[in-house]
């Protein structure tokens, strides 16, 4: 299903009974977070706050609060169908020419998707129906949420930040937290390996210009929002990938103040720049770990223009102890990772990032084991294959008779198939998320890999145990009479 903009998606959710309009006045300061947190933990609907206290712009929250809503935003009906998106990503990472007639026809769907990749530039757009500039710029008219009691200020959470490297034609889209400093200044909090930060670093090193153009789009269509968080190949534009997801080209319009393109149907757009050496202390804020993060210096963005639709909608979210919206998005990303990983490691049968592991800090992998030491190869392979897993602290590898998504199964494998000294790998002084305060040094820490597979001759000198399993004939017979037993 194609959604031209966020409003199209809202209509579909409302039609399905998956969006709740709240007319009661609710304060963006803490109160929306409490309602959203309770709702997401119960698997509830998207929330449309029509009357945020003190503001005239409504707030949309919990948009992607369930896996099925994420799938719907990608034009799919269930989270399992997101593996098709992963297969497309795997193809785009390493495209292969057809090897014969049958292979040619099997690849036609992939090539057909490519027709939707080029952006479509328009000359007028809803996102520029209203324009404020210079002294008239004031972001405090937006109902920006303060999410947790010790948060230092309101914070923009769902803005798509758009940048371009000095030597790059490709524009980068990313989601970064932005602390509000004043009516026209926000802090751009991005990790050093993320696309926007890399673009800024390249510009900083290779030019003497004072100002780095940057834009934040709020309330884009679902495909563009999801495209900004999916781990696509570095050579592919998020706009191009959004077109693939949507099934039609992404409409963009040139910013008023610079040459960057923004989604034409965004609700609100903040145009501005980063000064070469202007930074500020960011935080603390409650984060996806369930803790307040430490403070650090990040670049300051000066907003020169605000453009917005008539009667705009402010899209927002919060981060906290899982499950939160980023954790649910992580579950969906998990399904897309699987075909990408399997293309590199075909022996992997499942790959699971439990949401309670804060999205990426713990991975459980099941494999068809083929040789001694196989699990250790998989552990090192995952740490090095995709940059998304450079911060994964724990990797547990099990055989394919274990359900990676069932802790009962995984714990049984760990406690019966692992010998701590032989079957663990600890690597020290490796990159770690700087938000991880458990590491002894910010940004540098250790990782552990666990081999919870059955051990083969050469890995153990002992006779290995045989798992207990009932005869299939007995199980099938009992299945056939189970209802009659009325147990």
UniProtKB/Swiss-Prot annotation:
The reaction(s) catalysed by this protein are: a 4-hydroxy-3-(all-trans-polyprenyl)benzoate + H(+) = a 2-(all-trans-polyprenyl)phenol + CO2
Q: Where is the active site?
A: 287
GO biological process annotation, one example: ubiquinone biosynthetic process
Asked whether the UniProt record includes Metal-binding among its keywords, one would answer yes
Q: What does the note under cofactor report?
A: Binds 1 prenylated FMN per subunit.
Cofactor(s) this protein requires: prenylated FMN; Mn(2+)
Task: Tell me its EC number(s), please.
Answer: 4.1.1.98
Q: Which GO terms describe its molecular function?
A: 3-octaprenyl-4-hydroxybenzoate carboxy-lyase activity; metal ion binding
Pathway it works in? Cofactor biosynthesis; ubiquinone biosynthesis
SUPFAM superfamilies (alphabetical): FMN-binding split barrel (SSF50475), UbiD C-terminal domain-like (SSF143968)
Which UniProt keywords are given for this protein, alphabetically ordered? Cell membrane, Decarboxylase, Flavoprotein, FMN, Lyase, Manganese, Membrane, Metal-binding, Ubiquinone biosynthesis
Q: Name one Pfam family in it.
A: UbiD
Q: According to Swiss-Prot or TrEMBL, what is its membrane topology? A: Peripheral membrane protein
Where are the coiled-coil regions? none
- Residue positions annotated to bind prenylated FMN are 175-177, 189-191, 194-195
Q: Which HAMAP family match?
A: UbiD
Q: What family does the database annotate? A: Belongs to the UbiD family.
The name this protein carries in UniProt is 3-octaprenyl-4-hydroxybenzoate carboxy-lyase
What is the originating organism of this protein?
Blochmanniella pennsylvanica (strain BPEN)
Organism lineage string: Bacteria, Pseudomonadati, Pseudomonadota, Gammaproteobacteria, Enterobacterales
């Amino acid at each position: 299903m194609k959604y031209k903009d966020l409003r199209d998606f809202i209509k579909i959710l409302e039609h399905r009974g998956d969006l709740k309009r709240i007319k009661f006045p609710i304060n963006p300061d803490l109160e929306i977070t409490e309602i959203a947190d309770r709702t997401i933990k119960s698997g509830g609907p998207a929330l449309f706050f029509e009357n945020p206290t003190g503001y005239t712009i409504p707030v949309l929250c919990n948009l992607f609060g369930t896996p099925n809503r994420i799938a719907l935003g990608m034009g799919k009906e269930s989270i399992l169908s997101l593996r098709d998106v992963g297969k497309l990503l795997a193809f785009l990472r390493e495209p292969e020419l057809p090897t014969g007639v049958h292979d040619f026809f099997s690849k036609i769907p992939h090539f057909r998707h490519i027709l939707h990749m080029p952006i479509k530039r328009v000359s007028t757009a809803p996102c520029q129906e209203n324009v404020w500039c210079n002294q008239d710029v004031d972001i405090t008219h937006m109902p920006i949420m303060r999410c947790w009691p010790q948060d230092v200020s309101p914070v923009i959470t769902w803005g798509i930040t758009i940048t371009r490297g000095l030597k790059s034609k490709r524009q980068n889209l990313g989601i970064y937290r932005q602390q509000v400093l004043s009516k026209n200044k926000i802090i751009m909090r991005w990790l050093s390996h993320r696309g926007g930060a890399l673009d800024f670093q390249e510009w900083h090193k290779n030019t003497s210009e004072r100002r780095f153009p940057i834009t934040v789009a709020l309330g884009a269509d679902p495909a563009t929002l999801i495209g900004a968080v999916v781990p696509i190949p570095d050579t592919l534009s998020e706009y191009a990938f959004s077109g693939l997801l949507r099934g039609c080209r992404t409409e963009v319009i040139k910013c008023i103040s610079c040459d960057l393109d923004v989604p034409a149907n965004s609700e609100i757009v903040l145009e501005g720049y980063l000064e070469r050496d202007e930074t500020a202390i960011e935080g603390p804020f409650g984060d996806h770990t369930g803790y307040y993060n430490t403070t650090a210096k990040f670049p300051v963005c000066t907003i020169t223009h605000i453009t917005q639709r008539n009667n705009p909608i402010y899209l927002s979210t919060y981060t906290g102890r899982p499950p939160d919206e980023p954790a649910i998005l992580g579950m969906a990303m998990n399904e897309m990772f699987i075909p990408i990983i399997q293309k590199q490691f075909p022996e992997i049968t499942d790959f699971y990032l439990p949401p309670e592991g804060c999205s990426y800090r713990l991975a459980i992998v099941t494999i068809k084991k083929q040789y001694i030491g196989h699990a250790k190869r998989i552990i090192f392979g995952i740490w090095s294959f995709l940059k998304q897993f450079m911060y994964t602290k724990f990797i547990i590898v099990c055989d394919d008779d274990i359900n990676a998504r069932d802790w009962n199964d995984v714990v049984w494998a760990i406690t019966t198939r692992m010998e701590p000294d032989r079957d663990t790998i600890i690597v020290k002084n490796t990159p770690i998320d700087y938000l991880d305060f458990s590491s002894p040094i910010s940004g540098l820490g250790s990782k552990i890999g666990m081999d919870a597979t059955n051990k083969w001759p050469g890995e153990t000198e002992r006779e290995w145990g045989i798992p207990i399993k009932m005869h299939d004939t007995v199980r099938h017979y009992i299945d056939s009479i189970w209802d009659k037993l009325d147990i």
